[in-house]
Regions:
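Non-catalytic peripheral regions of nucleotide-handling enzymes
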Residues: 1-82
Length: 82
């Protein structure tokens, strides 16, 4: 089952040397293993969207989607798969 977090939850992210996320802290904590990456850019209505999404496994057991929002310079967890 998928749980979409509304609003998305802000987290602190540690990146590796290649700029991939390797750990998060905040409402969700632990090491993460990135699985997939994609970018979304566009001008939705009156606010531009520039996001880098990652699908990752948190603590070896929880699949989640997180993204970096370049317009506010912040990471968020947006979706978890139970």
């Amino acid at each position: 089952m998928t749980r979409l977090l509304r609003p998305p939850t802000a987290v602190d992210v540690t990146l590796d040397h290649g700029r991939a996320p390797i750990a998060i802290a905040g409402a969700f904590n632990g090491s993460i293993e990135p699985i997939a990456r994609w970018k979304v850019e566009g001008s939705w209505w009156d606010r531009p969207v520039v996001r880098e999404y990652w699908k990752a496994v948190l603590n070896n057991n929880l699949l989640c989607e997180l993204y970096f929002d370049a317009t506010v310079n912040q990471w968020f967890v947006e979706r978890v798969y139970d």
